[in-house]
From Swiss-Prot:
Disulfide bonds: 103-200
Keywords: ATP-binding, Cytoplasm, Disulfide bond, Nucleotide-binding, RNA-binding, Transferase, tRNA processing, tRNA-binding
E.C. designation(s): 2.8.1.13
Catalytic activity entry: S-sulfanyl-L-cysteinyl-[protein] + uridine(34) in tRNA + AH2 + ATP = 2-thiouridine(34) in tRNA + L-cysteinyl-[protein] + A + AMP + diphosphate + H(+)
The protein's name in its UniProt record: tRNA-specific 2-thiouridylase MnmA
Residues that, per the record, bind ATP: 12-19, 38, 127
Residue ranges of the region described as Interaction with target base in tRNA: 98-100
Gene Ontology CC entries for this record: cytoplasm
Name of the gene encoding the protein in the UniProt record: mnmA
Length: 375
């Protein structure tokens, strides 16, 4: 029988209820648990309160309640260089990036993992809702967790096999309400703390205002697909494909339907808009994606596979045929049914039943082999 007390697990503790309960459960299972608070961003909010200071206080309280040692580590430099600069660069290209995917790949499961190994960790853990399965050959597979509503495999889709082998997901078989119940029953300081929302480093702040601090906004024309000027946009980076709110456009003589962003023309600095949720320009039949990462490793040959996919968080799976090209590590994905608002810069993540296979970054979308002007 394995003696868990000889297995050290370093837990990334955010000051939230999920990572608090992860640390508690591991401690109850007899592991040698160490808590670490990551400071990735100088996050003074709009009211002048540094939320990281409050969060670290909560980590200290919970660590004391559980009876584990704790540390704080600053990854602001790593975060800026590996996540935030990528985030800004994608927006400059007119794309809509997913910084949470990159944060997991580069910070939580790279910088933090390296730090944990320096603390003689055998494994790391956090508060993610995900699960793993080890096959007979010792290969670790990423699986969906019990709580499908909180499933975070989408955000973990760029992790490697080496990273996955070093991770424990204590919340794999729990629902969020059960996690809250455990925290309350155990009297943890974070038991009733509300979940954080928004992009990991922006938090609750106004996104438009935040982005304008780092990228100069360039206003331009809002045009219909046939070139008619209908308004002015504040800067292409503020809009995403399929967006309805914030356009400031009213009904026309022809239609009372709301307006939606259906494309961008980066060269002309024009935002392409059209009335109607079901605008044909919002529907893609296929896409190209690059930077493919499979949890079980990259195949050395081309692969064609029928599976399902998500191209945004929390959307229901859609049926696809994936064509992997080993030469340049890309995929061409064909949708079983036309897919609405496929967005360059976002992650597409592949599933085979309960298993998450991995993901890639969307580059282009097509409608019947004609490229949609999404960037």
């Amino acid at each position: 029988m394995v003696d868990n007390s000889k297995i050290r697990v370093v837990v990334g503790m955010s000051g939230g209820v999920d990572s608090s309960v992860s640390a508690l459960l591991l401690k109850q299972q007899g592991f040698d648990v160490v808590g670490v608070f990551m400071k990735n961003w100088d996050d003074t909010d709009d009211s002048g309160v540094c939320t990281a200071t409050e969060d670290y206080e909560d980590v200290k309280k919970v660590a004391d309640e559980i009876g584990i040692p704790y540390y704080s580590i600053n990854f602001e430099k790593d975060y800026w260089e590996r996540v935030f600069e990528y985030f800004l660069d994608e927006y400059k290209k007119g794309r809509t990036p997913n910084p949470d995917v990159m944060c997991n790949k580069e910070i939580k499961f790279k910088s933090f993992l390296d730090f944990a190994m320096d603390l003689d960790a055998d494994y790391i853990a956090m508060g993610h809702y995900a699960a793993t399965r080890v096959d007979d050959n010792g290969v670790v597979h990423m699986m969906r967790p019990k709580d499908g509503n909180k499933d975070q495999t989408y955000f973990l889709s760029q992790l490697s096999q080496d990273q996955l082998k070093k991770v424990i997901f204590p919340l794999a078989n729990l629902t969020k309400p059960q996690v809250r119940e455990i925290a309350i029953a155990s009297g943890l300081a974070t038991a009733k703390k509300k979940d954080s929302t928004g992009i990991c480093f922006i938090g609750e702040r106004n996104f438009k205002k935040f982005l304008s601090e780092f990228l100069p906004a360039q206003s331009g024309k809002m045009v219909t697909p046939d070139g008619k000027v209908v308004g002015e946009h504040a800067g292409l980076m503020y809009y995403t494909i399929g967006q309805r709110s914030g356009l400031g456009l009213g009904s026309t003589k022809e239609s009372t339907d709301p307006w939606f962003v259906v494309g961008k023309d980066l060269k002309k600095n024009e935002l392409i808009v059209e009335q109607g949720y079901d605008s044909k320009l919002l529907y893609a039949t296929s896409l190209d994606a690059s930077g493919v990462s499979f949890f079980t490793g990259q195949p050395d040959h081309d692969v064609d596979l029928k599976c399902t996919a998500k191209f945004r968080y929390r959307q229901p799976d859609v049926g696809v045929t994936m064509h992997y090209r080993a030469k340049d590590n890309t995929v061409h994905v064909e949708f079983d049914e036309p897919a609405r608002a496929v967005t360059p810069g976002q992650a597409i993540v592949f599933y085979n039943g309960e298993e998450c296979l991995g993901g890639a970054t969307i580059d282009r979308a097509y409608q019947n082999e004609k490229q949609l002007q999404l960037v």
